[in-house]
Amino acid sequence: MPLSHIRVLDLTLARAGPTAVRQFADWGADVIRVEPPAAGGVVIDDRHGPDFQNLHRNKRAITLDLKSDAGHALFLDLVRDADVLIENMRSDVKHRLGIDYETLREINPRLVYGSLSGFGQDGPYGTRPGMDQEIGRAHV
């Protein structure tokens, strides 16, 4: 496969991010989906449903609590060996977690960092979550 030598860390949720990263997986990249622990022991996504299976096919997964010291340290170990990282977090969240581009490039200068956002990384709406339904109504 053309991308079999590439390791991608997937920190995306919803649809746009997982769809984009799925393309890497479909072309043979080693994609590791980094998932947060289930809130209150409840898994949000139906892992056996067709939508989840379609979005996350050909990906491996690990559950890490990036808010904990141990989870954050394990994540940084993954970053050291990664080629690409893709996330779709609000800018304030990734900075608070210490997983923004500026921080991670200190650990891995060759890391290609992709960030999806509905309203940009800064500006008046930079910290707002952005999903297709919200952006579609933005003109109203």
Name these PLM-found stretches:
Residues 1-139:
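N-terminal helix-loop segment corresponding to the beta1-alpha1 unit
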